[in-house]
A protein has these predicted regions:
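Short helix-to-loop capping/linker segments positioned immediately adjacent to catalytic or ligand/cofactor-binding
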Residues: 38-39, 59-62, 96-98, 135-139, ...
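A non-catalytic, helix-rich entry segment at domain boundaries
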Residues: 1-88
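A structural signal for short, well-ordered beta-strand segments
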Residues: 72-74, 109, 167
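Short coil/turn segments at secondary-structure junctions
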Residues: 35-38, 42, 93, 135, ...
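Metal-dependent nuclease catalytic regions and adjoining charged, substrate-binding loops involved
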Residues: 10, 115, 140-145, 150-208
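A general secondary-structure signal for short beta-strands and their flanking turns/coil
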Residues: 67-69, 100, 104, 164
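Non-catalytic protein-protein interaction segments used by genome-maintenance enzymes to assemble
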Residues: 77-148, 152-155
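Short, structured helix-loop boundary elements
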Residues: 44, 48, 100, 188-191
Length: 208
């Protein structure tokens, strides 16, 4: 297929040198657009290592070449259609800002695992920690993880006909993959979590 940014890609070509070339081209594309960072040769080395780790770990189970890919890096941007998501702020100059809470982001990969089930896959290169508490993220904590739940909510917007989603967060350097199951009945709790955070932010007077 033809990528919008780096051109033609031979999806059936698994040659090591060719795949390294693709990694290099993608690395060049992103680093050339992130000029505020001082990129070092070690950064490219790490990127290559992590990509090949995805290809090889678990006998290639999470290698996208072995999956039925629905979409790579889908972007989501949608308003939360709830009354509580409305906001209105008056700025110092008298300007009134009104609207609704919007959620936006990018998901690493969506795959079709069959029987009407899609899998949302998100890779992490860092540690499996809750940075707010410094404690390790367990399966129970991941079930309540706002990011993963927001990904599920976003995918219901992107793929409304799909009822069941698996969400896999893959800590490639700290514990491997953790897969959770989300369905439509989980959405009310997800919206309540988002509402609680949104209202906390709305009620914050300093800083504004």
């Amino acid at each position: 297929f033809k990528d919008n940014e780096i051109g033609e890609i031979e999806t059936a070509n698994y040659d090591t040198e060719y795949l390294d070339e693709i990694i290099d081209r993608v690395y060049e594309y992103y680093t050339s657009r992130t000029t505020h960072h001082d990129w070092k040769p070690l950064d490219l080395k790490h990127c290559r290592k992590w990509v090949w780790k995805i290809f090889n770990d678990d006998d290639g189970f999470f290698d996208p070449k072995n999956r039925t890919v629905v979409e790579a890096e889908p972007h989501f941007d949608f308003e939360v259609d709830e009354e509580w998501a409305e906001y209105s702020y008056t700025l110092d100059d008298g300007t009134v800002l009104e609207g609704k809470l919007a959620l936006k982001g990018t998901i690493d990969l969506i795959t079709d695992v069959g029987d009407g089930v899609y899998e949302i896959i998100d890779w992490k290169t860092g540690r499996r920690l809750d940075w707010a508490t410094g404690k390790e993220k367990t399966m129970a904590k991941l079930q309540k993880d706002p990011q993963l739940r927001m990904y599920h909510l976003a995918c219901k917007k992107l793929y409304p006909d799909v009822e069941t989603f698996l969400v896999t967060i893959h800590f490639m350097n700290d514990g491997g993959p953790f897969t959770l199951h989300f369905q439509d009945s989980d959405i009310p709790e997800t919206l309540q979590m988002i509402r609680a955070k949104f209202e906390t932010i709305k009620d914050t007077n300093f800083p504004q």
